[in-house]
Amino acid sequence: MLDFVILHTNDLHGKLSQQAAEIIAREKNSCDTCILLDAGDAIPSGNIYWRPWGEPILCRMADIGYDAMVMGNREFHFLAAGLESKVKLARFPVLSANIRCTKRSICSCIVPTVTFCIAGLSVAVLGLTVPMITKQMLAAKISPFWFEDPISAAKDIVPSLRDNADIIIALTHIGLRTDMELAAAVSGIDIVVGGHSHSLLSEPVWVDDTAIVQAGYWGHYLGKTELTISSAGKRTVHTSLIDLRD
């Protein structure tokens, strides 16, 4: 029997108290078979302004031990310099599989997927971001970036991930309703760790065989999703919320 744990936050908006950071780090360090993920909008900046020196909360998250995050709408910027500045202090992968750019080199700071080996399991994490610019928008004429529909992007990528991964996690910043549409449209995703809608889910939302989880907003809670795989291959999911408030 194998136990695999996903610790997750979303929509921090720059709010990560010292107490919250200590609890998250303690939970991460107490488990040898876990990953710590963030489902986007960790930073406080909006879509126009950016700090040239970077976002300090990403340094704190790296110090805590975050393994990856998905780019939320707050991490995105329509200029290449802005996007790079926003995420440059993250010492962990920042994901989005549905961002597109005129030259790959200008969004090399964003990767579509990352794979971890945990307790002998291959765990693939796929990032999906709410589309901020589409090709039909006027903004696409001045920005080097545009976004593909996240569900279409997942349909293209998940089958190839399934060939090599034991577990597939969609780390999304698209909102609960679209998470449910994603799970219904794309088979092979085990767990959706979501953000954007600020949904506080005390239990997973199930769509077919896919569990959807989300942990509210502003660092009030840490989500804990425990996946148990029996020797016969049967999988069970248990979720809980850890209160991080002062």
Locate the predicted segments by residue.
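Acidic, metal/ion-coordinating pockets
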Residues: 1-246
